[in-house]
């Protein structure tokens, strides 16, 4: 019954009409709480789209069988297709088969299995994604983003001490000053040993296997590419340590989850494995600064159906929050929104949508994403651009909110973030900024003293 509800919810998301979203997307906005700036609607923004580019693992399918399907019949169908079952993730509602098709026959096999509704519930390819960072010049701006979201005023109440933020990325360089002493062992979803976690879903068996997988994992305290440390220090760099940076939640702990290697690429399987580790380890806040050009990105619940089952389970049943960068293609995303993923676009110091930020129907929030000062894995200060950095800013505001009131359910944290937002008009939502840019100080006050 539970799996049926999740299935219906995903299907309902596709019934949301374009006209409803556009009807909510006009107008102009209230003044920011502690300054006189406003979010500005972009002028002449065109819904730029392009032909989808499907980058995926060759000859690999992710298959979620129907709960009522006979296991022997499913096994026979897989054998008849002349492929190989190379792995299984999760159990029960999260059971997902990793299937290697006959070489060159992925599309045919996918089409055949998708027609068989009796045995197969969801099928997708294992898509690959890149980190969402934009090259920037070496000129450093001030940490304007902290003032824009009223972080310093929020710190009068809480700095997020000990609240955990999971950074799904290339690992985090725990040895640098800004992350030393606060970066947990974490989890490496890219190794065979660590992927023991994928053998079990939530529950006693999943917890046991998750603990075993975590113990065998070497963790993710080394950044193999560099992107993860930039994201982690944006979120939670230590303050008052004689380094010229501070994270949005400087007291928070970082739980690194390595989902990408030296090439900076990740895929559905790695993220699903990471989410299973979240369920086993009790982590509640996840940031994923990866995307692909619309409509192929993570926001597409149809293309990434198994992954979306995992994300919705983490949100609805485990009480977690997921923050996802909208992407850096400067394109319109037509994918309908989902209640279990918070998609974040990027604005610049002019409080206007950046040229590179994707925007569209799935956007939930916006945050600064241009000229963000953070720390690289070599300990040097960098100024960076990208929705890779707007997403962890909102995730870290959520950490401040949860630290101010640990008893809040995840949906209450989301409601507070939305209610606190600086907007770009009287409309409650726009396709550029979603519900707006969360005000950290206002959100923390709401969490502490009520709406």
Question: What positions do the PLM features span?
Answer:
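N-terminal secretory signal peptides that target proteins for export/translocation
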Residues: 1-9
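Structural recognition of the beta-strand scaffold that forms the well-ordered cores
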Residues: 62, 98, 122-124, 164-167, ...
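Short, small-residue alpha-helix embedded
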Residues: 389-406
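Primarily auto-inhibitory N-terminal propeptides
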Residues: 32-136
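Active-site core segment of subtilase-fold serine proteases
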Residues: 136-253, 270-281, 292-294, 298-302, ...
């Amino acid at each position: 019954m539970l799996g049926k509800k999740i299935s219906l919810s995903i299907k309902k998301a596709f019934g949301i009409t374009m006209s409803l979203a556009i009807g909510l997307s006009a107008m102009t906005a209230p003044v920011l709480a502690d300054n006189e700036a406003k979010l500005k609607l972009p002028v002449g923004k065109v819904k730029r789209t392009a032909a989808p580019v499907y980058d995926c693992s060759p000859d690999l399918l992710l298959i979620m069988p129907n709960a009522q399907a006979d296991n022997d019949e499913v096994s026979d169908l897989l054998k008849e297709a002349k492929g190989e079952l190379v792995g299984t993730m999760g159990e029960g509602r999260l059971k997902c088969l990793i299937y290697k098709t006959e070489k060159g026959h992925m599309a045919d096999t996918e089409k055949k299995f998708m027609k068989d509704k009796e045995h197969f519930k969801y099928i997708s390819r294992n898509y690959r994604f890149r980190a969402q960072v934009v090259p920037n010049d070496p000129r450093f701006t001030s940490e304007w983003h902290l003032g824009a979201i009223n972080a310093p005023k929020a710190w009068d109440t809480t700095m997020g001490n000990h609240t955990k933020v999971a950074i799904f990325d290339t690992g985090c360089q725990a040895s640098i000053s800004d992350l030393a002493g606060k970066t947990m062992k974490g989890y490496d979803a890219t190794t065979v040993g660590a992927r023991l976690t994928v053998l079990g879903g939530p529950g006693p068996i999943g917890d046991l296997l998750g603990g075993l997988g975590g113990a065998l994992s070497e963790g993710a305290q080394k950044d193999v590419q560099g992107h993860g440390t930039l994201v982690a220090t944006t979120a939670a760099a230590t303050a008052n340590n004689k380094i010229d940076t501070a994270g949005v939640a400087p007291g928070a702990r970082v739980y690194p989850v390595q989902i990408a290697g030296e090439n900076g690429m990740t895929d559905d399987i790695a993220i699903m494995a990471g989410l299973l580790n979240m369920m086993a380890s009790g982590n509640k806040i996840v940031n994923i600064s990866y995307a692909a050009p619309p409509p192929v990105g993570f926001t597409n619940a149809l293309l990434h159906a198994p992954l979306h089952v995992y994300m919705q389970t983490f949100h609805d049943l485990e009480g977690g929050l997921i923050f996802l960068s909208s992407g850096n293609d400067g394109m319109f995303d037509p994918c309908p929104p989902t209640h279990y993923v918070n998609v974040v676009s990027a604005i610049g110091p002019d409080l206007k949508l950046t040229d590179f930020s994707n925007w569209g129907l799935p956007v939930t929030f916006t945050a600064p994403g241009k000229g963000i000062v953070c720390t690289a894995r070599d300990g040097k200060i960098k100024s960076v651009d990208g929705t890779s950095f707007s997403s962890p800013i909102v995730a870290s505001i959520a950490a401040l909110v949860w630290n101010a009131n640990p008893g809040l359910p995840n949906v209450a944290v989301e409601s507070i973030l939305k209610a606190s937002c600086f907007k770009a008009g009287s409309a409650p939502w726009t396709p550029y900024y979603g519900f707006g840019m969360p005000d950290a100080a206002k959100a923390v006050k709401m969490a502490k003293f009520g709406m």
